[in-house]
């Protein structure tokens, strides 16, 4: 970060926590500055008369009025190129392994580290020839970054259209020139992009393909589309982070960007320990081979939380521009909103609801609206799916962050503390949650899974809804007072809840459930439901029906790698015991 000519150096007038007020400094909004003798990284967030307001992304202890402030004249940008995958960054794209080498286990202040390794060499294979015309965003070659991910090297979207004068093949570092345009523009393996500016695309496409997560309650009842937005609000201990980890592990995106924003450091450690060992069900390679981590834990500087969210989404858009499906997990957007509230307080702005700034809704929308399935500048189709966790204090969904998030996102997975207390995981409340993608995705499920999928889904939801209606009566007078047919319905609902909805995140087989297996299980439960009613008509008592032999074997079949024989044997046993030969 070189500093420009005179006028780009000023001095500190006042300091208030992470907010520094400087004077005598030429600056524009969102310019990157170096504050104090140690050159702490900061960003211009306001201009009042001759004074410049800077939020500092590092601890401001020891900085004093009169210290110099330098403006780099550049906005906060990330480096996009080979070397992103498998890396773990802080909120402003400094690689944490590099910072550890420089300053030990605790990050020192004012340390600069490039986002991409300058020494690593990458094998570049050109896809265009000398004399060919290239447009912004076009793919000019590839680099095999990991066994799973082939990085496509793009003409930066902010470069003018031109003709290739020279293009080279071979091993290069990210700083080496790999192609030259006729107007003299040099293209490298990487380019920089300002984090607050969404990357351009040709057009947005309708979200008609589901993001398969391998979690039964999500895929069957509340699916999210590729290029969609989802929120997971829930009180502490209800399983937000485990659900996010499950999505990062098993969703059928080609790239996963995981942002730990203001949450516990141990949760990021868990990702770092587990992902290299876990196998991707589609490629058979470690999950880390497709993951980028942005860690900004709760004990890191507050201001950098905002940067980490923008850094993560910009990296996701870069992979989208190559034609990949990207899933981005932000855990948790509430911590980012709290950071905004703190900075807003320091800026002495008029507070909105619960002390959050008035622009909370527009900032959240700015982030979620960068999701989408698009036609890229290169003509490919890529998508960014955003899943944001929200941590409302005390599990109160009426607080501003949750409410503003719900206005923007189309899928709401409501985590319920009562379900978590009953050890029902994933603790997603099937009565409160919703997905607005169900109608747009039903054709995909009908074509790729079964024509009956949507009918089965509707039937199961009706059973669960009916159970909730009967639950009030049951709690008052007990289930014995109900007619037999309704008691059968309660039994079927129990099977749906305990066999289908409960899923074990730490069981090697049950942690991921393919869509075909989900369909087979739901169809089998519908079959059992039909047999129950037939047995009731044939004169069997409710106790005989509920205690029929074979139900336990059926419940255990989902834990088998090859589940079909076990499930069929259990179904046959249930049929014989209920209806005879």
Curated annotation (Swiss-Prot):
PROSITE patterns: ATPASE_ALPHA_BETA. It catalyses: ATP + H2O + 4 H(+)(in) = ADP + phosphate + 5 H(+)(out). It is found in: Cell membrane. InterPro entries: ATP-synt_VA_C (IPR055190), ATP-synth_a_Xtn (IPR031686), ATP_synth_asu-like_sf (IPR023366), ATP_synth_asu_arc (IPR005726), ATPase_a/bsu_AS (IPR020003), ATPase_F1/V1/A1_a/bsu_N (IPR004100), ATPase_F1/V1/A1_a/bsu_N_sf (IPR036121), ATPase_F1/V1/A1_a/bsu_nucl-bd (IPR000194). It is a peripheral membrane protein. Gene3D superfamilies: 2.40.30.20, 2.40.50.100, Bovine Mitochondrial F1-atpase, Atp Synthase Beta Chain, Chain D, domain 3, P-loop containing nucleotide triphosphate hydrolases. GO terms for molecular function: ATP binding; proton-transporting ATP synthase activity, rotational mechanism; proton-transporting ATPase activity, rotational mechanism. GO terms for biological process: proton motive force-driven plasma membrane ATP synthesis. ATP binds at residues 234-241. Coiled coil: none annotated. It comes from the Archaea. Its EC number is 7.1.2.2. Its main location: membrane. SUPFAM superfamilies: C-terminal domain of alpha and beta subunits of F1 ATP synthase, N-terminal domain of alpha and beta subunits of F1 ATP synthase, P-loop containing nucleoside triphosphate hydrolases. Keywords: ATP synthesis, ATP-binding, Cell membrane, Hydrogen ion transport, Ion transport, Membrane, Nucleotide-binding, Translocase, Transport. Component of the A-type ATP synthase that produces ATP from ADP in the presence of a proton gradient across the membrane. The A chain is the catalytic subunit. Belongs to the ATPase alpha/beta chains family. Has multiple subunits with at least A(3), B(3), C, D, E, F, H, I and proteolipid K(x). This is A-type ATP synthase subunit A. The gene is atpA.
């Amino acid at each position: 970060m070189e500093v420009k000519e005179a006028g780009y150096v000023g001095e500190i007038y006042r300091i208030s926590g992470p907010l520094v007020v400087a004077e005598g400094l030429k600056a524009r909004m969102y310019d990157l500055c170096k504050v104090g003798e140690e050159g702490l990284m900061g960003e211009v967030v306001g201009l009042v008369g001759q004074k410049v307001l800077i939020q500092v992304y590092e601890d401001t202890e020891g900085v004093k009025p009169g210290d110099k402030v330098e403006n780099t004249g550049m906005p906060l940008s990330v480096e996009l190129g080979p070397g992103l995958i498998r890396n773990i960054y802080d909120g402003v794209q400094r690689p944490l392994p590099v910072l550890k080498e420089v300053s030990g286990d605790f990050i020192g202040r004012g340390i600069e580290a490039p986002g991409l390794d300058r020494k690593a060499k990458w094998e570049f294979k050109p896809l265009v020839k000398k004399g060919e015309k290239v447009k912004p965003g076009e793919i000019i070659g590839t680099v095999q970054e990991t066994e799973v991910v082939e990085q496509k090297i793009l003409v930066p979207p902010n470069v003018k259209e031109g003709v290739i004068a020279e293009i080279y093949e071979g091993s290069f570092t990210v700083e080496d020139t790999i192609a030259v345009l006729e107007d003299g523009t040099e293209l490298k393996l990487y380019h920089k992009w300002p984090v607050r500016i969404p990357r351009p695309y040709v057009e947005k496409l309708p979200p008609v393909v589901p993001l398969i997560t391998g979690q039964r309650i999500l895929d069957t009842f509340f699916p999210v589309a590729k290029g969609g937005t989802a929120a997971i609000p829930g009180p502490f201990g209800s399983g937000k982070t485990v659900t996010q980890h499950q999505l990062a592990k098993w969703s059928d995106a080609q790239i996963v960007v995981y942002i730990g924003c203001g949450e516990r450091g141990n949760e990021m450690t868990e990702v770092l320990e587990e992902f290299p060992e876990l196998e991707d069900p589609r490629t058979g390679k470690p999950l880390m081979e497709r993951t980028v981590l942005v860690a900004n834990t709760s004990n890191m500087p507050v201001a950098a939380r905002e940067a980490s969210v923008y850094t993560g989404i910009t990296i996701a858009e870069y992979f989208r521009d190559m034609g990949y499906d990207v899933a981005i997990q932000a855990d948790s957007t509430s911590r980012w909103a709290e950071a905004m509230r703190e900075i807003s307080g320091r800026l002495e702005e008029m507070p909105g609801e619960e002390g959050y700034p008035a622009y909370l809704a527009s900032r959240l929308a700015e982030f979620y609206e960068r999701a989408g399935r698009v036609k890229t500048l290169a003509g490919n189709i890529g998508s960014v799916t955003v899943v944001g966790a929200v941590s409302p204090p005390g599990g109160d969904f009426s607080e501003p962050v949750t409410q503003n998030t719900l206005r923007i996102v189309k899928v709401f997975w409501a985590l319920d503390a009562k379900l978590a207390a009953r050890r029902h995981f994933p603790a997603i409340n099937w009565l409160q949650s919703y997905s607005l993608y169900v109608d747009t995705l039903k054709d995909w499920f009908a074509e790729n899974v079964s024509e009956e999928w949507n009918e089965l889904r509707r039937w199961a939801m009706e059973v669960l809804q009916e159970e909730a209606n009967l639950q009030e009566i049951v709690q008052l007078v007990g289930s014995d007072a109900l007619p037999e047919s309704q008691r059968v319905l309660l039994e079927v609902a129990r099977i749906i809840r305990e066999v289908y909805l409960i899923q074990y995140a730490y069981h090697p087989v049950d942690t991921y459930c393919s869509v075909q297996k989900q369909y087979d299980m739901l169809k089998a439960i519908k079959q059992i439901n039909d047999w129950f009613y037939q047995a009731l008509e044939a004169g069997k008592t409710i106790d005989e029906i509920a205690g029929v032999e074979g139900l336990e074997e059926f419940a255990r079949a989902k834990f088998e790698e090859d589940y079909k024989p076990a499930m069929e044997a259990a179904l046959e046993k249930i049929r014989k015991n209920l209806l005879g030969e």
